[in-house]
């Protein structure tokens, strides 16, 4: 129920990002946006609690330095609303929909509230179709669903952002529809780089407008927790509008953990008693409210790729553990694999996908994937024996398994387009058929004669054969 707009109140206390406002008469509804001036800037506060004595407790969407008690605040009578539509493409906006790219105002098709109901069961679509990414380890072992939810899990510095940028490069460029990128509590430098890369690669035009394909919504690390807790919803609102117009939208979020982290900062300031590991007691509810809206309906689809930081590499931490339940495919990045120099450092045994079923991907793909996992699992179980007794104590059959597993491990690596700058090797996009063919041949022993090094950082199996010849020539 929207309250009458233009009601005024006065600030009674400011504690960091939380501001208490006293109203006379009607109280603004929970989640309403109320506005005040902070210097020359418009400061938006979102109502979080009704405290009694005509006072509401609000969360600020920007810094509160400079606010004073007794300052006047106006109720807008509605939740935070942001511009949506084609005018947002090629532009960067913040949590409240203001442009931050210095390219003038956003020409929008109207405003849409950032708090929406999730689509009803009857409106949701359940078709299963594979989204080919061109990344071998993903396409083979944990394939992504079109219109599905994908999570990239990893600790600090194992390559989540590089992987998300490669997916943007491979999928968004080839993709005819629109994309939305929500930068939630990540590095401003990365956001800036991404903006310029999009312009250089032709995904976006400077200043937006005709020909731009991706809308950017940023609430980075330097923003107060209120903005970081809501910027994911702002990005999602832009994506939902495109979906409801019948588009197939790609929605990238980097990083969902920061959304949870911001919620936990705000929760403590709101006086809630923390739950496990100090997270907010409403962790599952907050995550559900965001994730249930990211869905494919009969009108259009949203395929979302979400980077999820794993604190201290512990997948059982409540923040990553809560996100697991919502995803169709999980790509787990492993520090032990990145330490071997194998990139992308995707764990082939820990990553899962509901799409990896013979009825969806076909018998050949399914059997090849399972064969690869079987060999890698056998190698994993032999590692203790190798560490204690050495390779010589293994049976001939086990030695062969180990040799093939090490080749598979290296063949799961691949040079990325977005990493060309710092690796010096050109990126590779590998078709699904080539990926299946290559791994099947390794499992069947057709390339037992090639050295391990031939499989490292190549695209297709033909490139590995070429590299093997080159290595043999150099050794001769």
Curated annotation (Swiss-Prot):
Its EC number is 7.1.2.2. It comes from Rhodopseudomonas palustris (strain ATCC BAA-98 / CGA009). One of its GO terms (molecular function) is ATP binding. SMART domains: AAA. NCBIfam families: atpD (TIGR01039). This is ATP synthase subunit beta. Belongs to the ATPase alpha/beta chains family. The keyword Membrane applies. Its main location: membrane. ATP binds at residues 154-161. F-type ATPases have 2 components, CF(1) - the catalytic core - and CF(0) - the membrane proton channel. CF(1) has five subunits: alpha(3), beta(3), gamma(1), delta(1), epsilon(1). CF(0) has four main subunits: a(1), b(1), b'(1) and c(9-12). One of its GO terms (cellular component) is proton-transporting ATP synthase complex. It is found in: Cell inner membrane. The keyword Membrane applies. Produces ATP from ADP in the presence of a proton gradient across the membrane. The catalytic sites are hosted primarily by the beta subunits. SUPFAM superfamilies: C-terminal domain of alpha and beta subunits of F1 ATP synthase, N-terminal domain of alpha and beta subunits of F1 ATP synthase, P-loop containing nucleoside triphosphate hydrolases. Coiled coil: none annotated. It catalyses: ATP + H2O + 4 H(+)(in) = ADP + phosphate + 5 H(+)(out). Keywords: ATP synthesis, ATP-binding, Cell inner membrane, Cell membrane, CF(1), Hydrogen ion transport, Ion transport, Membrane, Nucleotide-binding, Translocase, Transport. InterPro entries: AAA+_ATPase (IPR003593), ATP-synt_VA_C (IPR055190), ATP_synth_F1_bsu (IPR005722), ATPase_a/bsu_AS (IPR020003), ATPase_alpha/beta_chains (IPR050053), ATPase_F1/V1/A1_a/bsu_N (IPR004100), ATPase_F1/V1/A1_a/bsu_N_sf (IPR036121), ATPase_F1/V1/A1_a/bsu_nucl-bd (IPR000194). It is a peripheral membrane protein.
